[in-house]
Amino acid sequence: MKGIIVANTKYIFVTGGVVSSLGKGIVSASLGKLLQARGYRVTIQKFDPYINVDPGTLNPYEHGECFVTVDGHETDLDLGHYERFLNLPTTRANSITTGRIYQSVIDKERRGDYLGKTVQVIPHITDEIKRNVKLLGAKNQFDFVITEIGGTVGDIESLPFIESVRQLRWELGRDCLCVHLTYVPFIAAAKEYKTKPTQHSVKQLQELGVQPDMLVLRAEHELNAEILRKVALFCNVSKEAVIQSVDVPTIYEVPLMLQRQRMDSIALEKLGLEVGPTPELNPWKDFLDRMKRATDVVRIGLVGKYVELQDAYKSIDESLLIASIYNDRKLDLRLIHSEKINDANAAELLADMDGVVIAPGFGQRGVEGKFAAIRYLREHDIPTLGICLGMQCMVIEFARDVLGLEGANSTEMDPQTLHPVIDLMEDQKNVVNMGGTMRLGTYDCTLRPGSHICAAYGKEHIQERHRHRFEFNNEYKDRFEAAGMQCVGENPDTGLVEAVEVSGLRWFIGVQYHPEYTSTVLSPNPLFMGFIKAAINK
């Protein structure tokens, strides 16, 4: 759709109440998608109330996946949703934490920027929060900045962010809108939905000085008109601005569900903008239609050590789903714990898989299971995709079992190994701090013509995002290639090996980068597309 000129950037804040994990990120991404479909330039940012500077050092069991932006910032997994919905890259400015806010304020205090004043939460912390909110809208790059406030209203750690929203609503006037997402529980014994938690959540928000313009009610099933009217009355919100977000088979149906309730139109009306005709969203609908039409199944295994947590490999899961749909297949994803697989049971766990992904990660735990899985997959020519540590494990297994390098390993796992086929990158050897110091962000990669991976991308020069400290040891490169593991992707500036594949196998590819970070609903990453095609043709 043709772009629309907006005089002032509009700011939409999305807060949550009652409980966490209601789907503020999905609602934010869905609203952003609807506005984008109308021709507006939209970006979404996430404010997380934890004191970590970023989630880069957080255990996936604590936080889920760590997403990496195009400029190399480690962020919350919600940014992955933003990118997959909007088909646009995010940057450091799209992810802010309490830790970063405080770090910035303390750095300013140390420089003397506050001229000897007492530094306090109000105004210094709130001013820094507001500065970061406005940063994305300052250069006239976006018509809408949607800001998701992490956590739940009433949490002590969220108070400075809610106060900042209150101040911004006063400062921005009609250029600002507040959407509050709450939960409406169903009480089985009484056989009815209860709105009291929503009323109390809105009351808490009002006590903090913020009156929501729009409510989104999360519920398992559709709510009746009387419940919506009651919520509108007691929460002081217009009836048409009470939107419901019920459980649907896939998160990608949420934009259409919100569009049917005119959420984007209501937002435009409240912001004083022309509504215009409702966009068709045809490419999005086509994607959902393909999902519903698919009947044949592709069975993919994911071997990793964090499989107990649903969100630990979120971008990989979604990338596999999207690629499967575009290959007209339903995805049957089997999660295989790398600590529970060995040579004895590998056949039992892997034999009926159409393809297997060896997941990324860090540390010694679970790698021996990955070696066992890789050995079975290689020997039985089952399509395999290794990502980051997954690629490194493919290299180590090949070194041990094909090259005969006994004890070959990564210096991450065994600093004393006699055959460090994976070694710490040279520029990492003097790094002391853990946070934000890896090789992060987008780098160039040149692919070897005639390779499977080059055929998948359809071009020789690509860019992908990275998150690692260790790399393939080029001292072993000739031996690997002579034995059949080809180094088919390299960084053109450093010679760092970015991709390997084994000659003679249908699809046995490992990549040092993370292709899942660039796969979106309307633009699936070619590597996942190629992998699923290989799995289908197994």
Predicted regions mapped to residue ranges:
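C-terminal and late-domain segments of enzyme folds
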Residues: 440-444, 448-538
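Active-site proximal loops enriched in glycine and acidic residues that flank catalytic Cys/His/Asp
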Residues: 16, 46, 219, 246, ...
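Short beta-alpha connecting loops at secondary-structure transitions
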Residues: 62-70, 248-252, 358, 379-387, ...
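Cysteine-nucleophile active-site neighborhood
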Residues: 22-25, 29-33, 37, 349-444, ...
